[in-house]
Amino acid sequence: MGIHTTDSTNPTDPLPTPATRAGREGLEALLARPGAAVIGLDFDGTLAPIVADPEQARAHPEAVPALAALAPKVASVAVITGRPAGVAVRHGGFAGVSGLEHLVVLGHYGAERWDAVSGTVSAPPSHPGVAAVRAELPGFLDRIGAWRGTWIEEKGRAVAVHTRRAEDPQAAFEALRAPLAELATRHGLIVEPGRMVLELRPPGMDKGVALLEYVREAGAESVTYVGDDLGDLPAYAAVDKLRSDGVPGLLVCSGSSEVTELAERADLVVDGPEGVVRLLRTLAAQLD
């Protein structure tokens, strides 16, 4: 498991030391050649605190200033999220910010892309199974007797069922996994589990695929990835793959008590979005 950062908010504090040799090599490569480094970050739970209503999620108040200080010093910063790219841009407050010209948002696990330079979103046509599931899901949940407090989030190229507001969120989550997987399969979709949420989305794209393709496109010589949830595990696997190909990488976990799998695999664990912001700020200061 990675070590935790300290509680200090002083950006001149020394960087924490990753707990693994591979993580230390990844950090050393970032510091040695920042202009050839890609930094990838999840949004919810990493840059933005988890809230009961995802529509109310916003980036940590210091996230954009920290990114704006760091982004000009590296090859690129990529926010990789299951949200639509445009929603992540709005909730993150990324548009029109000086210093974020090197930022891209890869939404819907890379199916959509927003570039800060152009300010536009590019995307392929939607999977027809999403529209079919969207139409069927309310009645489907009624028929299987879904837990009270369960609710549906419309995500454009995906549909999510949340259990965080249920009387027993974890029990509701477990009870819905198999029925929703059956529904998704029937329409050519997959189920992506997260922190008290089950997302029905098209197969073939995940954060690992998105990160791998972007790092290779950028010709990066090192990669850092920061995440908090099960959907970030493919991105961790992508960093492992890049490491095996000779590209140093650093795995950072935005720690929480809800998901422990990432902390167990990370080189470095920080204390949620506040810890992520602190790390970004400290990196920016170290690269001055």
Residue ranges and their predicted role:
Residues 1-43, 47-52, 62-65, 69, ...:
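Non-catalytic pre-domain segments flanking phosphatase-related domains
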Residues 11-20, 34, 60, 208-288:
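Mg2+-dependent phosphoryl-transfer enzymes with acidic/Ser/Thr/Gly-rich catalytic loops
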Residues 38, 76-78, 104, 224, ...:
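A structural signal for isolated positions on well-ordered beta-strands in alpha/beta enzyme cores
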Residues 41, 107, 227-228:
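Active-site flanking residues adjacent to catalytic metal/cofactor-binding acidic residues
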Residues 46, 85, 231:
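Conserved Rossmann-like nucleotide-cofactor binding loop
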Residues 58-154:
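Active-site phosphate-binding/coordination module
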Residues 96-112, 182, 262-277:
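Structural recognition of alpha->loop->beta junctions
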Residues 147-238, 247:
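Conserved acidic, metal-coordinating active-site core of Asp-based
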